[in-house]
């Protein structure tokens, strides 16, 4: 039994809207019939191209089934995830968030690539989550005000541009020379340079330095100190409007909570070396919420990988639930291996966009293609991508056919959908605005549609 976010009936939409509640009720109507007739050979597939809707819908379905004593297996997937790193990151955010909580029996990673490219991605994702099984118990409590089914962003008091109503920040690690050389290209909010000051401080850049260096620096402009937990007693001795403090679950709560309450200028850098880092990092933030502490939290994740795809999958899977739970005020990805800093930074921004927390580029929703696709899907995606890549904030659907395309790209602002041999239809939202136009003209007419409708974006 499958339910897609973009294909709900008018009856369901009129009552629930395009919401997780509507998706779940649409599924439960059929499951109740199956249960009534004692039919158990059922697998459920709940999908959306929106990772937040997908995860919340599956969580709500599991809760609803439990209440009605149903225990059908679940198939997981982020529909029409796209291609390349974006498709992998989006899939890992959604699927990983559920697998990490023990939800899911089969998965599919839906990529606009050759079908055989999907299997290694899916296998690595499952294998990575499986490594966390059998871990030592994390003796944590859940904050009673936290709603796992309908989570809202954790309330924090902003420190400069971190927390509060700000979008989550991106932190990166660079040595001093790299920071001086690459920072013009970097879009990161904070650059950690450790114990070495950059040779030249670029205007608008923010540098995180070890607290000892901060104390010694004559010119502290654009510098922000970071303290390991062992240096917590020195926090009060250092004057700065923003301080970072590295913490992990298991630090004596009475010590670090008192420090955070006394110093609202602290941003917590939450780390973990636990086998189940998600559980450990969740535990620290819930401990803070129980104590009423509202300091922002940046999640720092450390890897030792040489393969960029593995890095993207693992980092996205680790961050998925933390973002969807509303706990994330920033991400800091680090890697001890042969992966370029630009790839690490790009992955961080990609994860935030996949989690619907921060938009940094155009988003593409595209199907894998099938026998009904009557045009060169991958070549068309490349041409549309090249022409629209700078249209930050737009979601563009590129679908092979009209059978599932309009429904499965329901979250897109604009759509390019195969309508027959040599014919394309263009969509604005869910409305078809140009029917059966020649394929050779379709990309240009899509651009014209965007530029006419969104001149502030389309004419960049």
Q: What are the residue ranges of the model-derived segments?
A:
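Beta-strand/loop-dominated core regions that host nucleotide or nucleotide-derived cofactor-binding catalytic loops
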Residues: 421-424, 431-455
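Nucleotide-binding motor/catalytic cores of P-loop/tubulin-like NTPases across gene-expression machines
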Residues: 402-408, 412-432
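Catalytic alpha/beta core domains of metabolic enzymes, predominantly
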Residues: 4-159, 242-244, 249-391, 395-398
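A structural signal for short secondary-structure junctions
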Residues: 102, 162-164, 326, 388-391, ...
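Radical SAM enzyme core and accessory elements
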Residues: 179-184, 415, 422, 426, ...
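Active-site loops and adjacent core secondary-structure elements that bind or stabilize anionic groups
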Residues: 126-238, 242-249, 262
